[in-house]
């Protein structure tokens, strides 16, 4: 089946209720020169896209949401309508490139065509060029999109990566079929029992998420969104992050979120706002994608909703608290609640879930301030048409009153942070990016001079 799931379709609803929202996710690859000509690039791209049918499909919507949107082959598909070329004034610098990315990501994709675009950007200094790839979020989550984008590289031509990409939903031979409602009684009973057990396990997580969403955050960084964006990015060596991880027995995600926390803290202070416990309640997507589903084009995520400790002044204490809160959020059932909710929603008639999602999207959300998503990327350097990919920056959208978003992506030997912000609210997205780099450097310096003492059975620096 090629229908969208409830989660996939929710990204369309988020656009429907707010004309200023564009829910495309992106990846910006900066590549060594020279840039290929348009004909050669189109020919190479066509060859690499051929194994993945999704790039040639558009959505067929049902009137009044009477059925789930469905992927269908576009009879008028023209690659030239999806690949655009633009040039910066030579020699284009990083600020000019990021300004262009902000403008391009603010533009909505045309729902009458396959929901993706590729922009070839020329004019960068040192003969470099760039590729911005945009995919609508209803088409793929961050991990699926990263695998799709890696499939466009030269490395994918020598293996079966692209050919393993499947459609959004596999054929369902038993159980429930959307529209037909054919049910096997014994399987339905088993499924119902499993769902109920999941609901019980996720009850605590549900209460935590509900409390987070319904409690207004003490922050000016959530509210209505304009139609203009700012973009900036940070880059830190993975070796530095891993050194902090080893020293303090934390994860890469802990270090990244602690750095983001410090940067937001500085922004609050400069805006004259006192950082409080609930000033940075953050939506942290959690992948539920199994290894066997890495190449499937859909969304498979749950969520956590921790308060990042912007009220804490000490960098090391911030790292400890981030680690502790993420550990508690995972153990407390927040991620399980998201899984259970999606499992239930996908078993209900689509008109019912579409109505409910649309209603929720229209409610003024003031509890969550930002989103921070971390996607593992290629650990080997990539090449495109024989040219090295020097940098790979992620771009995640903003929506639902979240005026900033931070996407993290590991590539080769570095960890990249992409910051997208509402133009009217954040005057300098570069300040957030620089703050992240400074925060990581500070943690690295602390790790080099700090001795970690062990209590019986645990590190003294970890709560």
From Swiss-Prot:
Catalysed reactions, as listed in the record: an acyl-CoA + a 1,2-diacyl-sn-glycerol = a triacyl-sn-glycerol + CoA
Keyword terms of this UniProt record: Acyltransferase, Glycerol metabolism, Lipid biosynthesis, Lipid metabolism, Transferase
Pfam annotation, one family: WS_DGAT_cat
Induction: A member of the dormancy regulon. Induced in response to reduced oxygen tension (hypoxia) and low levels of nitric oxide (NO).
GO MF term set: diacylglycerol O-acyltransferase activity
Coiled-coil residues: none
Superkingdom of origin organism: Bacteria
Enzyme active site: 137 (proton acceptor)
GO biological process per UniProt: biological process involved in interaction with host; glycerol metabolic process; response to hypoxia; response to nitric oxide; triglyceride biosynthetic process
Stored InterPro entries: Acyl_transf_WS/DGAT, O-acyltransferase_WSD1-like, O-acyltransferase_WSD1_C, O-acyltransferase_WSD1_N
Gene that this sequence comes from: tgs1
Pathway assignment: Glycerolipid metabolism; triacylglycerol biosynthesis
Protein's UniProt name: Probable diacyglycerol O-acyltransferase tgs1
Organism: Mycobacterium tuberculosis (strain CDC 1551 / Oshkosh)
GO cellular component, one term: plasma membrane
């Amino acid at each position: 089946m090629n229908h969208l799931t409830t989660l996939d379709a929710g990204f369309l609803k988020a656009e429907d209720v707010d004309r200023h929202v564009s829910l495309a996710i992106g990846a910006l690859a900066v590549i060594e020169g020279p840039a290929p000509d348009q004909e050669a690039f189109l020919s190479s791209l066509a060859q690499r896209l051929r194994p993945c049918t999704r790039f040639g499909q558009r959505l067929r919507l049902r009137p009044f949401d009477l059925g789930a949107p469905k992927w269908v082959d576009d009879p008028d598909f023209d690659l030239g309508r999806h690949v655009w070329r633009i040039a910066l004034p030579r020699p284009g610098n990083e600020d000019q490139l990021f300004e262009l990315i902000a403008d391009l990501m603010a533009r909505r994709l045309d729902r009458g065509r396959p929901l993706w675009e590729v922009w070839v950007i020329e004019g960068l200094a040192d003969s470099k060029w760039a590729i911005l790839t945009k995919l609508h979020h209803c088409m793929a989550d961050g991990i699926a999109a990263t695998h799709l984008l890696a499939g466009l590289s030269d490395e994918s031509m020598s293996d079966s990566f692209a050919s393993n990409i499947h459609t959004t939903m596999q054929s369902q031979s038993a159980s429930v079929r959307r529209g037909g409602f054919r049910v096997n009684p014994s399987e339905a009973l088993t499924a119902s029992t499993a769902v109920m057990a999941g609901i019980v396990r996720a009850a605590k997580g549900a209460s935590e998420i509900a409390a987070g969403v319904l409690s207004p955050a003490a922050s000016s960084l959530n509210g209505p969104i304009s139609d203009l964006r700012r973009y900036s990015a940070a880059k830190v060596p993975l070796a530095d992050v891993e050194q902090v991880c080893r020293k303090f027995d934390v994860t890469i995600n802990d270090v990244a979120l602690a750095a983001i926390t410090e940067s937001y803290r500085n922004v609050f202070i400069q805006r004259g706002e006192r950082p409080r416990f609930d000033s940075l309640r953050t939506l942290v997507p959690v992948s539920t994608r199994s290894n066997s589903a890495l190449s499937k084009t859909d969304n498979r995520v749950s969520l956590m909703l921790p308060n990042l400790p912007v009220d804490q002044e000490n960098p090391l204490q911030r790292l400890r608290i981030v680690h502790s809160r993420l550990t508690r959020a995972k153990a407390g059932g927040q991620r399980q609640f998201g899984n259970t909710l999606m499992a239930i929603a996908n078993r209900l008639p689509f008109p019912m879930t579409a109505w409910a999602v649309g209603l929720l999207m229209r409610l003024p959300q003031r509890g969550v301030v930002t989103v921070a998503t971390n996607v593992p990327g290629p650990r080997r350097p990539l090449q495109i048409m024989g040219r090295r990919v020097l940098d790979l920056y992620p771009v995640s959208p903003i929506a639902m009153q979240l005026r900033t978003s931070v996407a993290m992506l590991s590539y080769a030997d570095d960890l990249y942070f992409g910051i997208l912000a509402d133009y009217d609210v954040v005057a300098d997205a570069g300040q957030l990016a620089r703050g992240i780099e400074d925060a990581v450097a500070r943690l690295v310096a602390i790790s080099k001079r700090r001795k970690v003492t062990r209590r019986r059975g645990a590190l003294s620096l970890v709560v």
